[in-house]
Amino acid sequence: MKRGNAKKVMALSIAVCMAVTTAVTALPTMQLRAQEPGQTAQGTVTETYSNERLDNGYTKVSAGYTFAAYTGEPILYRMGDVPQSAVYYMNFDYLANSESILPVEAGIMVNGEYPFYEMRQQKLESQWTSNPDQWTLAPRKVYDSYGNEVVSMPDKIYDWQNKYIQDSTYRYTQPLGIELQQGRNTITIELNEGTLLLGNLTLTAKPQVPEYTGSEAAAGDGFIEIQAEDFLYRNDSGIHAACEFDPDLYPYQAAKRVMNTVDAASFGQGGQEITYLMEVEKAGNYYIAFHYSQGDKADFPVFMNVKIDGRIPNTAFENHAFAYEKKYEMYTMVDGDGSKISIPLEAGKHTISMQISMEPVRESLETIEKIMSRVNDLSLEVTKVAGTNKDKYRDFSFEAYIPGIGEMMTGWADELGQVMEDARVYNPKKNKIAAYASVKIAENQLRSLAKKPDELIYRIDELATSTSSVNQHLANLIDSLNGNDFALDSIYLYQEDAAKQLPKNKNIFTKMWLGIVRFFTSFGEQAYSSTNTNPEHLQVSVNRSRQHLEIMQLLINEQFTPQTGIEVDLSLMPDQTKLVLANASGDSPDVATGVNYSIPFELGIRGALKDLTEFPDFAEVAERYNAGLIMPYVIGDRIYALPETMNFQVMFYRKDILDKLGLEVPDTLEEVQAMLPDLQMRGLNFYYPTARTVGMKTFLDTTPILFQSGGTLYDGAIDKAILTSEAWLLRHGQEACHTDQVLPGCDLLRPERV
């Protein structure tokens, strides 16, 4: 199935148009007030950036809904009429059948337009498992040839799922409602990534999470332990287990690597979810405890939706806060009063899931994004009225051109101060939340500018353009709030009489002893060392991370060796520059991967590499690459290496800026030069990679210009450079040449060349 296509189930009889177009709808440029109504400042800005998430986001659109919320029974939406005008919550059945590791992404339009910004990108995740038998309590363990446990490869589960329309960044825990008028409505789905099978589409009232009214005591001695590295499934293939040599974790071995925690670096984005299988022997109420750490947000919690059997039991499990803990600590879920939260469970198999939630910080994120947009607007306006001359001794009164500019910035600072106060709700013991330090810096900076707004003439960079500007500090905070790195060692469900079975962290003396043991065992067998290999096997040295190497070795052992009968030993390459010395000493590997593009030439001229053209299938393999990529590895008529990766430069642009200035996206450097005056008069610019090299310009940066102009580096032979080609004349014209100058290309006009 081609990318972007979709199939519809035969049972589907709804008014849905499956569109595969990739057209981009132009974002509207709106004139925005510098402040919300009700604030003291009266000034407005006329130079504004457009930001559809702010102008047309769900928060703003849903606040203007006029229809009542639908409260009836679920409606299977078929070709026909919607029974009444109301706010509906839409869910649909789907099966993501593409082989891609990426989630399916789709845009959903109602009656030909997107009701709000979040409808442009809907993520339809797949489920991934590492267990051959998905519903077994015995997970699959994979070990390398050294006896170390390695990360197992996840398998995609091809199964039907159901999902409501939600924000792809999961700033809303609950689904998003849409207004539908009574009568015929058309739903259009555009696939932007992947393929799927689409089933029933259903309109419902807003799903309700039961209100928490307190918990009953968990009487009994039941105890259930779940190791967090043993997933049942997860909704992102990138979520994986990891090994930490921490005695507080289970399992732990001093000499071997064992998977004993969820890698925090892989589990931190809003909406990511991990699910575990558990078996309850005794029905009853259970408390839930987690052995976890999260040191990503200093003094601020990470929020989770804890689900039992796929549902949030009550509001105490929704957006539950997990406090900042740099070291692994045991935590039992408690309510706002500090009482333990219990959950009733029947005997049998159940699932427990943890989904990262962003809803508690949504309003803070929206406030910060709004202020950033307005600071951008003000920066444009200041540059418009004052130009780009940053003379400190230039007299200029901004109040005459932007009335209320000081009060405007003070109002933004007040809003940022409120953001900090809102954060303190989750950690009242702290006067200042360290994770929100950037907010305080930005607030103080705005207050400083507000006191003397005329200093903006030379302090304009402090608003939006420098690395220490207000907007940079706010952008840093957004990155911090979006990061929720969460490491999980284990989950426990227990009853009152089994509380003593909860493991405690090791004491300092035990940790010291285990540290000594770990130190001495490190002098033993060195896994993936070039000295610890079988000379009868193919030796491959890899200049990449250990995890990358482990996955390579796993794939080789499972696929390559059984198919070819060739045994392969991989080893970590400590220093790629030592390959030349290794060749001199006779200890060089058979194959080296991940090395810099310059290394093959150094080895080739020393006769240390085999000519790849001698292999019978070389021509077939070489056709997979662009010929230019092989050039650095050619010496004479021999080729000594093939590229493993390819880097290339792409252009990205700010569509909101171009829309505001009425400029088109440039296709040529001439068009870039033509738009530079419009950009630079507003303090903006166009970046080209040659700017990063102050002195000598490298071929990496300059050859794209040369080749795009029809030029060439060599004239038939590699030893004759010809940077004086017709391409230079085509670009600059004959009038650029003079008899008293020696310029590239001008020799083509001399009589001896005619």
Positions of the model-derived regions?
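Bacterial N-terminal signal peptides that target proteins for export
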Residues: 2-13
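Sec-dependent signal peptide cleavage junction
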Residues: 20-36
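Extracytoplasmic
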Residues: 35-486, 491
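Paired acidic/hydrophobic, glycine-rich loop segments that form the ligand-binding mouth/hinge
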Residues: 188-189, 590-594, 688, 743
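Hinge/lid segment of periplasmic solute-binding proteins
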Residues: 513-534, 597-650, 671-675, 701
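Short, well-ordered beta-strand elements
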Residues: 533-546, 560, 566-571, 591, ...
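Extracytoplasmic "Venus flytrap"/periplasmic binding protein-like
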Residues: 558-625, 632, 656-664
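Helix-loop-helix "hinge/cap" segment bordering the ligand-binding cleft or interdomain interface
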Residues: 570-571, 613-616, 634-700, 705-751
